[in-house]
Amino acid sequence: AMLDQIETEGWLRAKAVVGIWPANAVGDDVELYPSPAGAASAATAALPVAAEAAPAAEVMRRLHFLRQQADKPPGRPDFCLADFIAPRESGVRDWIGAFAVTAGLGIDAHVARFEAAHDDYSSILLKALADRLAEALAEALHERVRRELWGYAADEALDPQALIDEGYRGVRPAPGYPACPDHTEKGTLFALLDAPGNAGMALTES
């Protein structure tokens, strides 16, 4: 099976980078501030979910989010991701995390080999497997963030079905999906994480 070949012959390499930063909401935007001393962007220690502190003067980056535009019955608000971060005027220092993962390093040579042999099936299958492996890596890394790197759910013990049902604490939105439809925020995230330098990842034109 191709999945066995990927593993035994080392066709693909996986890499990931994660960052956790102080943050506050300003309207529909989220301001990110430099991490305090000892809390590097590729965090290895637990950080508080929220702590009383005066907002930092330096804004490192801004994430721009869009508010829902749906017609809803009275009493049902249109949400924005910024609603889930403490407002700057609250005086509460909140935090935000992000990560980028890939399981496709090394794939180009094998795709080219299949396409040169007019083996479209194997080319498509390899791309699909790399995509699924990246999704699995994202799931595993998100769990490690919750339990270890950020540590806000250190005692979490979810079974596979609970993970599928997203029964964990927190959310994992991604640019290009309904909660964050603006693809341009990928550039901001890649810059924050230095995804090219830390994980060998690059954004495509699409």
Language model regions located:
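Activity-critical C-terminal alpha-helical subdomain
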Residues: 114-118, 139, 153-206
